[in-house]
């Protein structure tokens, strides 16, 4: 008969996933590629040098008590092997903070031949050996971001390619001890309304779970990183947090098995406050999975602007990051009331055609 080999890491994967999906905690996404990190640094007038990237990443991981609100941090490969400015391994600093190190493993988006100007995500070649090396280095979870564009269709081909790539990556990750974060980002770009987003998201998640099952991925040992269901960024319609929560939870209930331990939303260019309000609205009533956050810009933005590259601003910048982490922690518990928010935190962070 057909035997499915239980992976040697099965129990560990479940434990890792549950730890990341623990009450009041979420993920700090700090896996921007060096090029994107350079854009962040340029926005505060800094050059994109390894020293500056190291200074910024050191600021992020050394925030005192960060581990109370953050359970995992996604790193870019450079960061997984990097040390802080005072010479401690970044991985060790995270572990001391009670934060599980994760690693971005995809190799970016490239044009998908035969599609309607769409992309696919590369990085499966050599993934098994890279994953094993990342595990040795201390990583315990992985991330693979593929994208679906609504203005471009999306074509059946692009959706299938996205879903299949995610499923292969997930199987390879689990085989090497890493909990895969499954991320088919449905881009905010476009003028479409919320109903169109909902329709596309249903299609995408149906295919993703079909292929995850076909690849014998253990659902208890994965995490999801979906987009919230919102109108397109250029749409005339704006949706309240209540409406975003209603549509998004409806999608999850229809498509995501309760075996999945955690759903860690991406912010996808929402403002810091918007991302927190939407998450809070989704946690107003109990859910079958841990519904939390995996934010990059929506955790880092105010901290970056506060820092401005100046050593004397490090403490204030770290406090800004901690404030955001704490706000999202409250939102994970459904207890965020929007107190003490700055104008900077309310700024729209959407960038057209954004790439990590």
Curated annotation (Swiss-Prot):
Signal peptide: none annotated. GO terms for cellular component: chloroplast. The record marks 356 as: Necessary for preference for fructose 1,6-bisphosphate over fructose 1-phosphate. It is found in: Plastid, Chloroplast. Its EC number is 4.1.2.13. Pathway: Carbohydrate degradation; glycolysis; D-glyceraldehyde 3-phosphate and glycerone phosphate from D-glucose: step 4/4. The keyword Lipoprotein does not apply. Residues 1-6 form a transit peptide. One of its GO terms (biological process) is glycolytic process. Keywords: Chloroplast, Glycolysis, Lyase, Plastid, Schiff base, Transit peptide. The active site is at 183 (proton acceptor), 225 (schiff-base intermediate with dihydroxyacetone-p). InterPro entries: Aldolase_I_AS, Aldolase_TIM, FBA_I. It catalyses: beta-D-fructose 1,6-bisphosphate = D-glyceraldehyde 3-phosphate + dihydroxyacetone phosphate. It holds the Pfam family Glycolytic. It is an enzyme of class 4 (lyase). Substrate binds at residues 53, 143. GO terms for molecular function: fructose-bisphosphate aldolase activity. The keyword Calcium does not apply. CDD domains: FBP_aldolase_I_a. PROSITE patterns: ALDOLASE_CLASS_I (PS00158). Belongs to the class I fructose-bisphosphate aldolase family. This is Fructose-bisphosphate aldolase 1, chloroplastic.
